[in-house]
Structures are given as C-alpha cells and as structure tokens.
Amino acid sequence: MSHIYLLSPSSAVRDKAALRRGVKRLEAAGHQVEVDANALNRDTRFAGTDAERLAAIKRAAASGADTVMTTRGGYGLSRLLPALPYKAIAKSIDKGTHWVGFSDFTAFSLAVMAKTQRVTWAGPAVVEDFGALDGVDEITNLCFDDLMTHMSEGTGWRIGKDDPTAFSAQGLTLWGGNLSMITSMVGTPYLPPVTRGALFIEDVAEAPYRIERMLTQLLYAGILANQKVIFLGAFNRFNATPQDRGYGLKVVIAWLRAHTKARIITGLPFGHVPTKVLLPVGQTVDVVATRREVLVLWPHDHTHAHHH
C-alpha cells in the first residue's frame, strides 16, 4: 500500500466531484490518500494565495509520502519558482518520494531538475485522469501501478510511418513536458542546461503556427541542437483556420525535421489525453527504435537526475 499526498499547486479545483472520484479510485486500488488542507482553496484563479500554495508544497515535501500528486494543472507554479523549498524537495526525493504531474507541473519538474539534479515524474493528475467520468485509462493506470510498485523501468509505443527507424542511443537525459511551459522558462535559471538530451513535448489548445513559433525559440536558443531525440506527444484541442490552407501539424513536424539533427519520434502517449505513460524527468535513459516501435529504458533506482 502506497501513501499518496495530494496537493493543488496551480489552478483551483473546479470539479470537486471528479476529485472525489479520483481519491475513491486511488483508495480502492489500495492506496492511502492524504489530501492537503489547502487542496480546495481558491484565490482568484489559483488554488490559494502564493503563500498557501507554497506551504502545501512544503507539507508535501515533509509528508514522507511514497508519491506526491497534483489535483490538476492550469497555471500557477511559474509564480512560485524562486521560492520553492528546493532542499526539502530534494531530500524527499532522496528518501523515495515520487513527485508526479503534468501541464503546469512542467515548471516544477524542470526547476527541480535545474536546481537539485533530482528526478520527478511527468504523469497523470487526479482530477483529469483518476477522476474521469468514464474511468481511468488502462495504460495510464498500468504505468502508475508500475511506479507505485517500483517496477517502472521503461516505456514504449508504436512510432509514426515517417519516423526514423532502427537506431539506438545510450545515456541520454530525458526531460521536457508542456511546450508552452518549457518555452516560458528559456533564459531563466529554472531551465536545466541539458546536453545529449531526449526531449519530450506536448501541448493543448495551441494552433500549429504557435507550436512552430515556440519551436523556433528553442531552435534559436540553441536548445534543439543539444537534443539527440525529440519525442512528440499529443498536440490537440485546437481549431484550424481557413487561412492555414493546409498548413498543420504535419507541416510543423516536417519543418522541425529539416531544422534539427535530432531524431524526431511521434506518437508518444502523453499530453492532455487520457493515455499517459509516466516519464522520469531528469533520468538517464537509453532509446532503442526498431521498425515499428521505440523503447525508452531507464534504471530501477530513479532518485538522481544527471546533467551530461
């Protein structure tokens, strides 16, 4: 049985019923769920004032939980980066706590990686994933179980028909998350200086031209040149416009392939979609691609991140 600590470090929880469902499902799976005292706080759009949300992170770090999870993403962690209790977070990770989240949580993961060289996990949130009306996605659930039982040692998926095949790369640093969040951190001390990277990206409600514009920033900032592999997750919930005239994600991906030596692999099951694999942000990984699928493999003990 795992001890899960639940907090709201970003936007306020609107769907309380989904939160209750998520907690019930986690409990039904045999976990002991501890909900932070401020989890349902609201201050304008945020889940409490900056001070309240920081206090929740400090409590989570001191909880001794096996896993710290967020209720939801949204916006709010960017405000807290200078004040995060990095030492306490690093200590909790060294003692075996997994910090898990996605979307706005990207800011937390990358800042912790930059400041402490520790591994956190890109993965599900309680409201969106465990509280979903039609049940928890099977793959998301299996990956989460693997993490809970310390069995997590890699992930794999079917790659796109235009993706590069039959290659392998060892000792890459896996990192990434939400593209808008990554881009917002360029030029700050909270973006880790990764070389020999395996970068994964996803985004939601961003038109293809906006995704391309963010990628140009990563390109011109010299970040793409340091990646050996770039994994593309889901880019969804946007509306095409008549002026696009056939310009879409396929064109963006073709542009990306033409402007970076990194191998671009599509189809990563991650993003604002039901199926989410769990990815250790900051972990050293091996990447192996066959004709049809790609495998990302990491060691069992995932407490320390590495900057190469």
Regions found by a protein language model. Give the residues of each.
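ATP/NTP phosphate-donor binding region
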Residues: 1-64
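Conserved anion/nucleotide-ligand pocket segment
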Residues: 117-181, 187
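Internal helical hairpin/lid segments
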Residues: 193-246
